[in-house]
């Protein structure tokens, strides 16, 4: 979609509340695919597994089928509790910081949790033309999380004999053969959000070039 006039803070906050609500709904069912309707038809959604393995979904269909489909299948009972949200209405962005918890209790009665700070960075746009004309949608999303901590928590659940078959199946799915997984050189969209990568929001000029 074309770039649209800026959104008001009230509009972003209203949209954000619907986003938090659909998050809770899909966590309850274990099927995240309905969240796809919050994304623009041409949205991009990505994150990094390692320096040379990245995930990227381009378009609403890939987001539905891959990002919140294949990548989330088997995580029944997991929930992503937003701890803090920062909204920049001038740029049409929000950053949400979340804790990733499993819904599975350890021997002490504490819930297994992926430690470290996780979050999602969103860009919003009002759509022009098409079926979504006039609606606010997510134009791009980029996530980050602590991958070593993720692996540690998954293995702790397995070693305790508490991993359901659905989680074990999900853990068996990985690597570059999985749809949406790319080497860095092959990513179909930029690691940084497209408008940021294009330099549209520079807040500090580059440091002097290294000479050594």
Per-range role (PLM):
Residues 2-11, 72-212:
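A beta-strand edge to alpha-helix "cap/lid" segment located at domain peripheries
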Residues 3-42, 73:
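Short acidic-aromatic low-complexity motifs
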Residues 18, 38, 66-70, 157, ...:
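Residues that form generic nucleotide/phosphate-binding pockets
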Residues 19-21, 64, 123:
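Short, well-ordered amphipathic alpha-helices
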Residues 32-97:
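A solvent-exposed, acidic/Ser-Thr-rich amphipathic alpha-helical stretch
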């Amino acid at each position: 979609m074309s770039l649209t006039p800026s959104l008001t803070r009230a509009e972003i906050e209203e949209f954000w509340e619907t986003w938090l609500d659909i998050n809770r709904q899909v966590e309850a069912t274990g099927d995240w695919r309905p969240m796809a309707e919050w994304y623009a038809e041409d949205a991009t959604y990505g994150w990094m597994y390692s320096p040379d393995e990245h995930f990227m979904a381009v378009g609403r269909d890939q987001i539905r089928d891959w990002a919140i489909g294949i990548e989330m299948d088997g995580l029944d009972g997991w929930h992503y509790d937003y701890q803090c949200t920062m909204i920049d209405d001038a740029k049409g962005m929000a950053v949400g910081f979340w804790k990733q918890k499993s819904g599975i209790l350890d021997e002490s009665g504490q819930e297994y949790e992926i430690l470290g700070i996780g979050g999602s960075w969103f860009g919003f746009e009002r759509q022009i033309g098409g079926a979504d004309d006039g609606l606010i949608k997510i134009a791009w999303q980029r996530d980050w999380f602590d991958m070593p901590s993720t692996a540690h928590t998954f293995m702790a659940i397995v070693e305790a004999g508490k991993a359901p078959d659905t989680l074990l199946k999900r853990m068996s799915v990985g690597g570059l053969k999985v749809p949406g997984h790319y080497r860095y050189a092959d990513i179909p969209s930029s690691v940084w959000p497209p408008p940021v990568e294009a330099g549209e929001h520079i807040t500090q000029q580059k440091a002097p070039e290294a000479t050594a």
